[in-house]
C-alpha cells in the first residue's frame, strides 16, 4: 500500500467525517483515509455507501451478519443499515463514496453485498482519490463522474460473493 496515493487532507480517518456524510441530501460524499483504529463503532448513513479497502482484510458487522471484505472487493451498504467496521490492521485504507438515494435506483442498490472489483473500478476509485468531502450537482465534471461510478456498479457487479456469516 502506498500512502502517497491518499490525498494529504484525508490521510487518517477523522471519525467526525461520518457526521458530514449526510449533511447535504443531494451531495455525493467522498472520503479516502487510513483507518488508524482497530474499530469503528456502529453507525449508519442516510446515503448508500460504497466501501473499498486496501492493505488488509476488513470485517463489517451488521445486526444480521458479519461480512468478510478481502482485497480487490467492495462492499455495498444500503442507506440506513447499522454497521461497525473492524480492520485486520489500523493501516488499512478505506475508500468510501456515499450516494444519495434516487427514486429510479435499480434493485441492486437496496441489497448489501460483496463484489469483486475489476480494473475499471480500480481506476475510477483511484481517480476519486483527489476528492474529499461533499460533491454537489453543480460541481462538474466531478458530480457526473461520481454518478457514473454509481450507475455502472450493477453492470459490473453481477456476481455477489457469499462472504458473510449470520450474526
Question: Residues of each region from the PLM?
Answer:
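Generic protein-terminus/edge-of-domain signal
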Residues: 1-57
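A generic beta-sheet turn/junction motif
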Residues: 46, 62-64, 89
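Short hydrophobic beta-strand segments that form the core of ligand-binding sensory/regulatory domains
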Residues: 49, 74, 84, 94-100, ...
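Short acidic-glycine-tyrosine-enriched beta hairpin
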Residues: 64-79
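Ligand-binding loop in jelly-roll beta-barrel domains
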Residues: 81-112
Amino acid at each position: 500500500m502506498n500512502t502517497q496515493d491518499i490525498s494529504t487532507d484525508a490521510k487518517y480517518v477523522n471519525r467526525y467525517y461520518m457526521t458530514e456524510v449526510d449533511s447535504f441530501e443531494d451531495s455525493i460524499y467522498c472520503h479516502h483515509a487510513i483507518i488508524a483504529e482497530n474499530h469503528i463503532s456502529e453507525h449508519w448513513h442516510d446515503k448508500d455507501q460504497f466501501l473499498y479497502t486496501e492493505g488488509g482484510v476488513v470485517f463489517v458487522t451488521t445486526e444480521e451478519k458479519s461480512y468478510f471484505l478481502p482485497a480487490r472487493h467492495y462492499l455495498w451498504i444500503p442507506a440506513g443499515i447499522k454497521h461497525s467496521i473492524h480492520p485486520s490492521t489500523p493501516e488499512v485504507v478505506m475508500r468510501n463514496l456515499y450516494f444519495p438515494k434516487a427514486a429510479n435506483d435499480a434493485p441492486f442498490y437496496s441489497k448489501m453485498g460483496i463484489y469483486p472489483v475489476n480494473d475499471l473500478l480500480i481506476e475510477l476509485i483511484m481517480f476519486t482519490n483527489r476528492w474529499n468531502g461533499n460533491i454537489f450537482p453543480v460541481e462538474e465534471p466531478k458530480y457526473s463522474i461520481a454518478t457514473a461510478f454509481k450507475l455502472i456498479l450493477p453492470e459490473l457487479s453481477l456476481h455477489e460473493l457469499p462472504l458473510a456469516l449470520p450474526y
